[in-house]
C-alpha cells in the first residue's frame, strides 16, 4: 500500500499544538522570558531557561525543544515574545507569542523587524520606514535550493544556463559573438571577420584540425599562425600544435554536444584576463615594517600572496595560449604622506617576487589635504572622490581598462563597485570580515555604535557591494551560511534593521550563484614544515631565542620566562577585542595546571609606540592588568608585533621544536590566515570554533576546536592536549601531520589562482551572453547609493591632521 502523503504543518501550527497539549509548562517557560523584561535574548539564554525548567523530562517536550534550538534570538516586549527561527541554513521563520492570551502568530520579515525596532523606539511601528528588498529582482534568476550547493555558484550557473543557452544551434550564436569580440588593445584574438556564422566556424575548425594532425605536436603555433588567419582563426588557441588542437577539439565538442563541464574547461583555456586591479584602501599597505600597525594584518598578507600566485598563473596561461602579452596587476591602496617609517608614502612600489605587479598608492583628496592614517571606520567621506582619482591613475598606468576588479573589505569593495560600474568590467568581491557579524546587535542598537564606528555607512556599503558584484569569493562555507548553530557572515545580511534609517527585508540570498568558495593558502617559500631541516633558516635561531627567552625586557619583548624547557602556547594577532588575545591570557592565567604544563608567548601590539587606536589602547591596559592579577610573570612572554614574515615562518617552526601549539582564540575569525600558516609549518593548531577555523580544522584530526565564550572548557582542551602529548609524543605528531595533510588537500595558492582565473572567465562569459549584469538591480542600487549612502557618508566627520584617529 502506498504511503499516505501528509501536509507539512506550519511553524505556527506546530507551536500552537504544543501550547494546546502542554499549556501550563509552556506558560511557565515563556513567563520566565517575559520576567527578564524588555530586551533581546540570545539562543543560549533561551535554552538555559528551557533546560532549567524541563531538565528531568526533556523527552516529553522534544518537538518544542527542536524549535527552540533553531531559534537564534528572541525579542521580549511583555506580554509578547517574538522568535527568529532558523530551521536550516539560509532559511528563516518568525513567530510571536502572547504569553497572556496563549496566542501564536506568524510574522513576515517586515513585521518581525518592526516589532524588533520597538526595543529602541516604542513608536517605531507607526512610522513609515524605507524597506530594502532585492528579492523581486532575483525572482526569475536561477538559484540552487540545496545547502550542498552553497559556494558552488559557478558549477550551478553553468549547468542551468548551458541547458538554456544551448537548446539548439541558433542558441549558440552568443558564444560565436563572444569569441569574435575578443581583443587586446585593439588586436584581435581567437576569431577574425572571416568567420560570420556557426557553420563557417565549424568548417574552419575542422580544416584547422586536419592540418594540425599532420604536423608534429610540438610545432610552435607561430609557424602556422598566418595559415590559420586565412581560415579566420587568430592567436590565442595555444602555443603548440598539440595545445591548439586540444582547444579546437574542445570547442568542436561543445558545438556538437554542449555540456557545462566542457564549457567551463573551454572558457578556462581562452585568453580573457591580462589586467587586474585589486583594491585595499585602508591601513598601512606595504611589503615590510607594517604588520601589526592599526588596520594592518592578514588582509595585507593575503593580497601579497594572492598577486604572486595570480601573476604566475596569468603568465603560464598567456604562454600556453601562444600570446606575447605582458600582464599587469595593480594593488591600489591609499598613499599616506605621514608614512611613519614605511613605504606607504611612495606612489608606486614593485611587489617583490613578481615581474609585473605594483602597489599603486593614491591619496585621499580633501580641500586642505590629509596626511595621517585614518581608521578603516572613518574612511567613508573620502571614497567617492578617491574612486575618481583611482580611475584616472589606472588609465595612466595601464593604458586600458582592467579585465577584473577585485575589492577587499568594505571600503575596497565599495570603491570596486563604483569603478566596475563606471568602467563596465567584471567585479569580484572579497569581504575578509563583515563587521556586522563581529559586533553583535550593532544593527538594532546602532546608536550605541555609530558615533564611534559609523556602521550605518559600512553596512550600507556592504549591501551595495554584495548586490552589485558579479561574483563573491569566500574562504569558507561558514562565511556564507555559517553552521547548524551559528549564522553566516553573509547570511546575517538577509534581514536586519537600522532604526530610523531603513529596514532590510531581503538584503542578500545566500543561495545566489554568485557565491564561490575559493580558499587561500600560505606562501610555501616562507611557511613550510619544521621537518624539512635542509630548508630551515637556522641563521634566525639566535634572534628567535633572544625574542623568546632573553632576560632583557625592552620595547620588543616584556616579561621573562623562568622555565624554557616547557612547550610553548603561541599566539599571534592584532591586539583588538575580537581577536581576544587578552581572553587567551585570562584563560591561561585562571588554569593553574595549564601554567604548569606550558609557557605562554603572545605576539600582539607594539610596546615601542603609543597606539592611536582606542580599542587597542583598552586591550593594552587590560593585558597588563591580567598579567598582574594572575601573577603571570615567569609564565608569559609578550612580544611586540613582528614585521619580518620570513623570520615569523621560522618562529612557527621553532615553536614546533618545543612541542608547542598555536592557539587562535578569536571570538570570530572570518578565515584564519595565521591558522593556515601554523598548520603549513606543522605546528599543531587549536583555534576558535567561530568562523573559518571551524572549517579549516577537522576537530581531533588536523587540529582542535575551542569556544572562546567558554574559556574554562577551552583551557581544559589545552591541558588535555599537552598531557596526551607528554604521555605519548606520537599524539603531537599525529595532529601535526593531520594539519599538513589538510593544507595540501585544500589550502594552497596554486589551487586558488587556478580557480580565480576560471571564475573570471566563466562569469565574464555569462555576463556577456545573458542578463547576468542584473541591470534592474543596479538601477535600484544607484538610487540607494545616491539617496542614502551619500548622506550617511557626508555625516562622518572629516579627519584633521594632529588629532587622534582610531576606534
Curated annotation (Swiss-Prot):
Enzyme class: transferase
Catalyses which reaction(s): an NDP-alpha-D-glucose + D-fructose = a ribonucleoside 5'-diphosphate + sucrose + H(+)
Keyword terms, alphabetized: Glycosyltransferase, Transferase
InterPro entries from the UniProt entry: Glyco_trans_1, Sucrose_synth_GT-B1, Sucrose_synthase_pln/cyn, SUS_EPBD, SUS_N
Species per Swiss-Prot/TrEMBL record: Hordeum vulgare
One Pfam family this sequence matches: Glycos_transf_1
Stated name of the protein: Sucrose synthase 1
S-S bridge residues: none
SUPFAM superfamilies: UDP-Glycosyltransferase/glycogen phosphorylase
UniProt keyword annotation of Transferase present: yes
